[in-house]
Amino acid sequence: MMKKTALCALLLAMAITPAAIATTTLSLEGAYVEARSAQVFIGGCVWNSEAVTIGREAIMAWRIEKGQIDGIDVTGFSVVAAIAGEANLAMEPDAPRRTVLYVDEMANKVQREALAELYTNRNARMFGNVIDVVATPISFVDTAEGYSVRAGREVELTATALHIDHKSFEQCGDAQWYEPFVPLQDSTLGVTVEHSYQGSALDAQWSDPNTQSAFLGRFSF
């Protein structure tokens, strides 16, 4: 069962500044997957028709395989963000958007607060207004060719690597139109098997499976 926490109030009260973030000692690495409601690899005509009207929703997920924040061990935990904006999230990076941040309920209070503070501030522009921080069960597992993520009953994202037949794609004028939302190592284009948000906090729900709208990779910072 999901539990709303006092993390949102805590983060607002702390009013963390960029200088404070810079003095935080941290080291995190692990697996990452994201998907948005716009195809990242598609023909130019389709991309042009989608660019203004969609791409306003996204899910981002991190699995921390090794990590510490100011000496707090956060190894083994996952963090997921569900984002809904008023415009294409990539093309209009300063357009208003709202985010629900999910933090692994297996973490203790100190660990959850450290994760929420770090991810909220590192992704401040991408997240926009973080309207809720929720402690919930998070599953982030490897599949045969990608990752599968669940955050409580509200978020599901499964993506597999996109295998590109360049000759057939070139005939259709397909190309990559977007980059991942965050810096990655070994970034791979992906296809969503499932991509959905069914919560109520964002005043928007979506389901966008079977599209070339994902990125998979490794992160470290």
Placement of each model-derived feature along the sequence:
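Bacterial N-terminal signal peptides that target proteins for export
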Residues: M1-A9
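Context-gated lysine
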Residues: K3-K4, K66, K109, K167
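Bacterial N-terminal signal peptides
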Residues: C8-T17
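Acidic/polar, glycine-anchored loop/turn motif associated with catalytic or activation segments
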Residues: A20
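N-terminal Sec/ER secretory leader and immediately downstream segment
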Residues: T23-V103
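Mature, soluble, non-transmembrane domains
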Residues: Y102-F219
